[in-house]
Amino acid sequence: MRQTVYGILIPFLGTSLGAACVLFMRRQLSDTVQRALTGFAAGVMVAASVWSLLIPAMEQAAWMGKLAFLPAFAGFWVGILFLLALDHLIPHLHARSNQTEGPKSRLQRTTMMVLAVTLHNIPEGMAVGVVYAGLLSGTAQITAAGALALSLGIAIQNFPEGAIISMPLRAEGESKGRAFLNGVLSGIVEPIGAVLTILGTRLIVPALPYLLSFAAGAMLYVVVEELIPEMSQGKHSNLGALAFAVGFSIMMALDVALG
């Protein structure tokens, strides 16, 4: 149980440490740095979706033979559509954009920026929760080391995300303390989502392949809809692509080495 608690809190710690950058850094992150950090986060999320979620989902459905892809296929698409729905139902504003997404709202600009990151963090919390639920259920395809690898990978990419949200909030006029707090709060949905998922472990076990791929679909939606456009903004540069490759490689190595 202790390793499960640690696994849930590690990604949240990554967000909190990243948000703490606003307490020590005087200047806003440059576009170049933000592009690199966003590309890195995207790479980690894609690798985690493949090695930690989609592959285990298909392995657990191996008894279906040539149709083992069906649970992963179905869960993946439900995850995509779920995030698409949230994207249209929740008013939010990405840090490097002036165009509000979702329904019209009178919410403050800073509030909608926090909502954008919170929306992004929902699938990550679900991914951690589903993996640890599978571990607690004794599923052979999910090991403690593999679950830890996912938690560490998400924590690594949460660090730059924490900075990317807290620094713009500071630039919008919030105090350092408030910008830090909002950065931390944007990541609170991760442990909450993970705990809620684990609490339903008994109901989840039969549907684990679907839920693993659901989390993967939700994460990849965020990557394609949000992160890839953000890392490609401004003057053309290969920096975002290279940072993506670094993040992908690190997460792949973590999962294979620890899994």
Annotated model-derived regions:
Residues 1-259:
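Intrinsically disordered, metal-sensing/regulatory segments
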